[in-house]
Amino acid sequence: MSLFEAQPRPTKIYHSETYDRIAKHHGFNGQGKVVLITGGASGVGFSIAKAFAAAGVVCIAIVSRSASPQEQAKAALEAAYPSVRVVLFQASVTDSVRMPEILHELGPVDVLVLGVAVVHRREKATAITEQELRDAFDTNVIAAFNLTKAYLETPLPASGQKTIINISSAAAQVHTTRRVGYGSSKAAAAQVLQHFAVEQEQEPDGNPVRIFSFHPGAFYTPAVAQHFTKDEHKWDDLALPGDFAVWLAGPESSFLHGRHLWANWDVDELIGLRERVLQDRRFLTIGLVV
């Protein structure tokens, strides 16, 4: 069983690997579109970059701090998808001056993926320092808030639609120990994006912005290997969050604007919940359940 598969969920089917419905029949038209991914050089972010490249976007921009992983990601993407332009920006998402400059230099962006996150030491809350907590909130919440604001102020792309995809975590809603800063900051970030989503619905311009948060899955990384053996759980495939993000960027997901989702949830079952989602503003959001 997958690490979080036993958690309550709105769908019967729980995917640990990608599947044709989102990998081949996602409904997203990448023609002429530009995608900006923070943290897109490795891990989940790179999985998302590959999926959008496969979907035929014209340009993928990657923002991260380290040059070497960026160059490796660029080389891999251009080798596999020679028609896709890959642009690199070496910067920290916490730089509230540089990030708006990057948006200006890049031009209109169709899809913004908030993929950078800070994860502190896996220690009890009493052992985590104030600075570690601040670092988590500075990157996971404040930087996401500032970049979302800056993106909303940019001109609409030719497609007439902006999409913001926030890479969240199960830690935002599932009780996990030794994750005081990470879990609480991810929950706060999801709440921030929910506020943006509700306010965008009230804009008189027909809501040309769609906003989603989603848990990408559980992956066997070197950090995870310090606490679990590989055979202890069934780990998710990194292709899953990439293809799920592309599906979110397509037209079928519009009714899920402002919701907190999991890549593991079956998209056809989610579509079957459309009326409930539209009627219950709190359904699939981060908040108090009574």
UniProtKB/Swiss-Prot annotation:
The active site is at 168 (proton donor), 182 (proton donor), 186 (lowers pka of active site tyr). Belongs to the short-chain dehydrogenases/reductases (SDR) family. Pathway: Secondary metabolite biosynthesis. It comes from the Eukaryota. The gene is nsrO. Keywords: NADP, Oxidoreductase. GO terms for biological process: secondary metabolite biosynthetic process. Short chain dehydrogenase/reductase; part of the gene cluster that mediates the biosynthesis of the tetrahydroxanthone dimer neosartorin, which exhibits antibacterial activity. The two different monomeric units appear to be synthesized by the same set of enzymes, among which the Baeyer-Villiger monooxygenase nsrF is the key enzyme for the divergence of the biosynthetic routes. The pathway begins with the synthesis of atrochrysone thioester by the polyketide synthase nsrB. This is Short chain dehydrogenase/reductase nsrO. InterPro entries: NAD(P)-bd_dom_sf, Sc_DH/Rdtase_CS, SDR_fam. Disruption phenotype: Impairs the production of neosartorin but accumulates no metabolites related to the neosartorin pathway. PROSITE patterns: ADH_SHORT (PS00061). It holds the Pfam family adh_short. SUPFAM superfamilies: NAD(P)-binding Rossmann-fold domains. Coiled coil: none annotated. Its EC number is 1.1.1.-. One of its GO terms (molecular function) is oxidoreductase activity. NADP(+) binds at residues 37, 149, 182, 186, 221.
